[in-house]
Amino acid sequence: MSEEQWVSLSSEEFDQLQKYSEYSSKKIKDVLAEFNEGGSLRQYDPHKPISYDVFKLFMRAYLEVDLPQPLSTHLFLAFSQKPRQETPDHPKEGASSSEPNVSDYNSDNAAKADEACAPDTESKTTKTQAPSKELEAAAPWEDPGALASSSDAPVVYLKDVVCYLSLMETGRPQDKLEFMFRLYDSDENGLLDQAEMDQIVSQMLHVAQYLEWDPTELRPILKEMLQGMDYDKDGFVSLQEWINGGMTTIPLLVLLGMDDSGSKGDGRHAWTLKHFKKPTYCNFCRAMLMGVGKQGLCCIYCKYTVHQRCVSKTIHGCVKTNSKAKRSGEVMQHAWVEGNSSVKCDRCHKSIKCYQSVTARHCVWCRMTFHRKCELSTVCDGGELKDHILLPTSICPVSGDRQGGKSDGSVAAKGELVTQYKIIPSPGTHPLLVLVNPKSGGRQGERILRKFHYLLNPEQVFNLDNGGPTPGLNFFHDTPDFRVLACGGDGTVGWILDCIDKANFTKHPPVAVLPLGTGNDLARCLRWGGGYEGGSLTKILKEIEQSPLVMLDRWYLEVMPREEVENGDQVPYNIMNNYFSIGVDASIAHRFHMMREKHPEKFNSRMKNKLWYFEFGTSETFAATCKKLHDHIELECDGVEVDLSNIFLEGIAILNIPSMYGGTNLWGETKKNRAVIRESRKSVTDPKELKCCVQDLSDQLLEVVGLEGAMEMGQIYTGLKSAGRRLAQCSSVTIRTNKLLPMQVDGEPWMQPQCTIKITHKNQAPMMMGPPQKSSFFSLRRKSRSKD
C-alpha cells in the first residue's frame, strides 16, 4: 500500500459522482456480471489491472452514461497505482496459502493495523490538489488519450474501484461487508489475510474523508476492529469473523449506511455522524466534542450524543416509541436526555449555558427544557406538537397468532407469533402520518427524514424507499381523524394518492404537501410553495393544524394504441392529477428529461432548469417537430369535435390545476368583473364565453389550451406572455392521433405512436391548503391609496 499514488477528488467532484450513482438503475453486482460469458465486458479480466479505456467502459456500464472527461480522468488517477508485487502476505490467485507463524503474526498485527489506518499524506481532500508529478508525466490532464497510449501508462485494480463505489451505494451494512469480503478474497478460500484487509480499510478511510469525517477518531477504531477480528488468532479472518467485527463497530456501520428502520421502539439508538455548529458535550464522558469535521455520533431519535470512541461503552438506551401495556390510559412520563440544551429554562426562563451538561435536561417528546432544580410535573402531554405526535402510550400492542404481516406493514414468517400494534390517539388530536421520499430534492429528503424522526414519534415517520406508502397507510388504517404529510415532489404525492385509493379507507385522510426538489406544480396550487428551502419544520406542522380542506379532482388517462402500430414508450401514469399535453411542450419536456438523465449534475437548481428549458425551446423553434399539429390530431370535448383547421397550433394542453412547469399558468387569470362560476358541466368552446370561465381544481372540469409554438411556450414560461389560447372547458376529452407524437402527463414525457386518448373524471381527494401568502408592504400601500 505504500506504493499507492492517490489523487483526491474535490468535494464537488465527489458530490457529482454521487449524483450520477443515484440516477443509475445499475448496481455494482450487475456490472461485475458483464465480465462473465455473454457480457459486454467479457473480453477483459477483472482480476488484472485495467487501463483507462477499460475503466471508462466499466464506468459507463455502471452509470449508464459517459462521465465528463475531467471527472473520468481525475477518478482514474485517484485509483491509479504501480502494479502490486506478490508477497507471501498476498498470495497469488489460486495458490494455496502456506500456514503462517501465528506468534509472528500476532506480534506484527498492531503494526500492520497502524499502517492500514495511518494518515495518508497524499490524499488530503483539498479542492486544488493536482496529480502527482509521476502521474502527470504518465498521463497529462490535457491529453487523456495518453493514459492509454503511453507504454508506462498507469493502471487501476478493479477491486479498489468496486469497493469504493459499493460504499456509496444504498444497502444493508452486512450485505456490503460480505460483498467486500468476497471481492478481496481473490483465492476464494473463504479467508482474508492482513494485506487484503488493509486494502478494504484504505478504501473506507478515503470515502470517510470525502464525507467530512474526522479520521483522527476513525483510525483508532478501525485499528481496534482489525486487531479484534481474528478471534482464533490464526492469522486470517473468516467471513463470519469479518461480519461479526464489522457489525459491532458502530462508526463503521454508520459509514456503511446503517439501516435504522428495525431499531424503532426497541431502545437501540440510530446513529448519524454530525458536525456541531456550537459547543457540544459527550453524554457519556462529559468531555467536549472536538474537531473541524464531523466530531461525534448523534442519535436521530433522541439526540443522545457521544464520541466515536465512547459509543461502544455502556451507554443509556434510546427512548421507547410504543407502549408495553395492552390497554390505553397509561400516563405518559417525560423522557429525559441530559445536556446540550443552549436555550432558556421553561420554568425560570433563565438561559442554560452550554457547559451545564449535568444541570439541565430536555424531554424528547414535548421538548420542554429545565434546570434540574426547576423540574415540575413528570407528566408529558406532547408539547406544542401534541395535535400531531403519537406518544408511546398511544401505540399499544395486540398479541395474536397471525400469518402475514404486522399492522404496521412488516412481514412475519408463517405461523410466527407476532406483535401487532393499534393506535389509540389522545382525544381531540389528529395524528400525522409522515411519508418521506428520501430521493426527492437530491439529499434533501434524507435530511427531512432525520428531522421528522426527532420532531415526531419515529413510528409515524416512514421512508418510502422501504415498501412505499402502503406500510404506513396500513399502520394508520383504523386510526380516526389522522392526516398525511407527503414529503416529495408531485410524483410522490400522486403515488401516495394512488395507494390511498387502493387502501379502501372508509374516509380518505386529508393530505398536506412538503414540496422537495423543483417544479412542484400541485404544491404551488395548494399554497405550500415551489420547494422547501430549509425553514422551521415545527412552523410547518403548526400551519397544518389550521389548514383548510379542498377537494382535488383526479382523472383517468386511458391510452389505446392502434393494433397495427408498434409499441412505443410505456405510458408513465394512468391517473392525471395536474395536466396532460401533446406536441411542442411535451417535445421540449422529453428532451429536457433525456438530458437530465444523462447529465444530472447540470439540473441541480431552478435557475439552471429554466436556462436549459429556454435552450431546448429555442432549438425546438427552429426544428418545428410538431408543426401543423391539427393535421395529425382530432380533439373532442364532451363528445363535441373542436375545429382546429383554422388554428395553427403546435401543442395542446389539458389542465386540471392552474400551474405547469413550476408556476406557469397556461389558462391565465380571469378578471374578477368577468368571472362566472358555472353550475353546469356543459362543454364551453365559444371564445367569448371562455374569457369568463374560471379555473378551479375541484370543479370536475378540464381546461383545454392551445400553444402556437415553442417561442410562445418560452414566452409564457419566462413571464413575457400571460397565457396560451383557450380552446374549451369540459368534463371529458378525447384525442385521436395518426402519427408518433411527444406527450407528457404530470411532467413525465414519452413518445406515443398513433392512438386514442380518453380523459374522464375518476374521483376527488381531500387536500390541505397552505397558509395564505402575507401581503407585502407595497401591496398594502397600494390598497391604502385606493381607499383614499
Swiss-Prot record:
Keyword line: ATP-binding, Calcium, Cytoplasm, Cytoskeleton, Kinase, Lipid metabolism, Membrane, Metal-binding, Nucleotide-binding, Repeat, Transferase, Zinc, Zinc-finger
Polar residues bias: start-end ranges: 95-109
Domain of life: Eukaryota
InterPro entries: ATP-NAD_kinase_N, C1-like_sf, C1_DGKgamma_rpt2, DAG_kinase_typeI_N, DGK, DGK_typeI_N_sf, Diacylglycerol_kin_accessory, Diacylglycerol_kinase_cat_dom
Main location, first listed in the record: membrane
Control of this protein's activity: The activity is calcium-dependent. Requires phosphatidylserine for maximal activity.
Gene responsible for this protein: Dgkg
Matching PROSITE patterns: DAGK (PS50146), EF_HAND_1 (PS00018), EF_HAND_2 (PS50222), ZF_DAG_PE_1 (PS00479), ZF_DAG_PE_2 (PS50081)
Known catalytic reactions: a 1,2-diacyl-sn-glycerol + ATP = a 1,2-diacyl-sn-glycero-3-phosphate + ADP + H(+); 1,2-didecanoyl-sn-glycerol + ATP = 1,2-didecanoyl-sn-glycero-3-phosphate + ADP + H(+); 1,2-di-(9Z-octadecenoyl)-sn-glycerol + ATP = 1,2-di-(9Z-octadecenoyl)-sn-glycero-3-phosphate + ADP + H(+); 1-octadecanoyl-2-(9Z,12Z)-octadecadienoyl-sn-glycerol + ATP = 1-octadecanoyl-2-(9Z,12Z-octadecadienoyl)-sn-glycero-3-phosphate + ADP + H(+)
Task performed by this protein: Diacylglycerol kinase that converts diacylglycerol/DAG into phosphatidic acid/phosphatidate/PA and regulates the respective levels of these two bioactive lipids. Thereby, acts as a central switch between the signaling pathways activated by these second messengers with different cellular targets and opposite effects in numerous biological processes. Has no apparent specificity with regard to the acyl compositions of diacylglycerol. Specifically expressed in the cerebellum where it controls the level of diacylglycerol which in turn regulates the activity of protein kinase C gamma.
KO phenotype (gene knockout): Homozygous knockout mice show impairments in motor coordination, long-term depression/LTD and development of Purkinje cells. The level of phosphatidic acid in synaptosomal membranes is significantly decreased. The number of branches, the total length of the dendrites and the membrane capacitance of the distal dendritic region are significantly lower.
UniProt entry tagged with the keyword Amino-acid biosynthesis: no
SMART domains noted in UniProt: C1, DAGKa, DAGKc, EFh
Pathway in which this enzyme or protein is active: Lipid metabolism; glycerolipid metabolism
Protein name listed in UniProt: Diacylglycerol kinase gamma
Domain named DAGKc: residues: 427-561
Zinc finger (Phorbol-ester/DAG-type): 268-318, 333-380
Entry's family note: Belongs to the eukaryotic diacylglycerol kinase family.
